[in-house]
Swiss-Prot record:
InterPro entries: ArgE/DapE_CS, Bact_exopeptidase_dim_dom, Peptidase_M20, Peptidase_M20_dimer, Peptidase_M20B. The gene is pepT. The active site is at D80, E173 (proton acceptor). GO terms for biological process: peptide catabolic process; proteolysis. This is Peptidase T. It catalyses: Release of the N-terminal residue from a tripeptide. Belongs to the peptidase M20B family. Binds 2 Zn(2+) ions per subunit. It comes from Shigella boydii serotype 18 (strain CDC 3083-94 / BS512). Its cofactor is Zn(2+). Transmembrane segments: none annotated. Zn(2+) 1 binds at H78, D140, D196.
Amino acid sequence: MDKLLERFLNYVSLDTQSKAGVRQVPSTEGQWKLLHLLKEQLEEMGLINVTLSEKGTLMATLPANVPGDIPAIGFISHVDTSPDCSGKNVNPQIVENYRGGDIALGIGDEVLSPVMFPVLHQLLGQTLITTDGKTLLGADDKAGIAEIMTALAVLQQKNIPHGDIRVAFTPDEEVGKGAKHFDVDAFDARWAYTVDGGGVGELEFENFNAASVNIKIVGNNVHPGTAKGVMVNALSLAARIHAEVPADESPEMTEGYEGFYHLAGMKGTVERADMHYIIRDFDRKQFEARKCKMMEIAKKVGKGLHPDCYIELVIEDSYYNMREKVVEHPHILDIAQQAMRDCDIEPELKPIRGGTDGAQLSFMGLPCPNLFTGGYNYHGKHEFVTLEGMEKAVQVIVRIAELTAQRK
């Protein structure tokens, strides 16, 4: 475990932010740097079949050390960090034996406060790794990477019985492209776990059904002084569209299993406006109903417009709830829960109010629930991870490998 923190700090020092709207995968050069570093480390550890695809998926195998027909299992994390907050020049702070209260994030006014983040009350006495208030930390998902790498080392050094262990590190998860170029056949695992979750004990096998909605509004601009009966204000139409979207079904008003509509971007002029929504729901029927609702709104607002003015709506599904695929293989969750209990952790099955590579992989034939990393407050300057949580994640990964080997 002594190298766990060292690995993590090494990985977060690299800027691996992904970038939306880029055709190439990985979308940024920084991701390649981390992938090449990990490839070198895996080879130094003696793993076999170490491959790095042209689309930036790194795979490797820790060969079984016991005979028998043991199913090959996998562990997966992503190398990119969120585009939502800078990942350049990350300067982690290590707070040992946290005693409560506010934690100053670097030099300035930014603090990590238990008033805003009550989970801190549960972490007294632990070692917290925070940001300096200027960037995100990158625990999402470099904590997962460090934990997988450390677990591999533990399995080797302690000669713990295990079958074939596949590992993979993927790019561009944060922009929804992480699993699109994942070769499930080449990975050759019966099932896998993404290590991309949050607090200790979290085990996730349900996620949102997700879609994006892009709306193009074409109006007609003339001088405001002579506009009566002629001007069609695209911005006004955009405002009318958003006014029709249920205000109490937005991200800031929902939790748990509740779905939402989220206006993620809007820009425009009188002549042309563009809106970008994301739609999320755990229930497939409700998900489809939300998409229909957006089409109905666009049709209603666009009714009676001049033929040269129009509203164009394009809906694209992003991913689906992996629950329907994972529940077909209950032993995958049983093993993970037993591993946690064996490590004195009470499993907490909860839905992911988001998505992971595992969601897409589950529909590609690789059932893939999500394990905790020990991290919190992802995608922003209040992100942090506990060293103890990371150590627990390593223990659970190792125990899953051990329990799987006992299922001969």
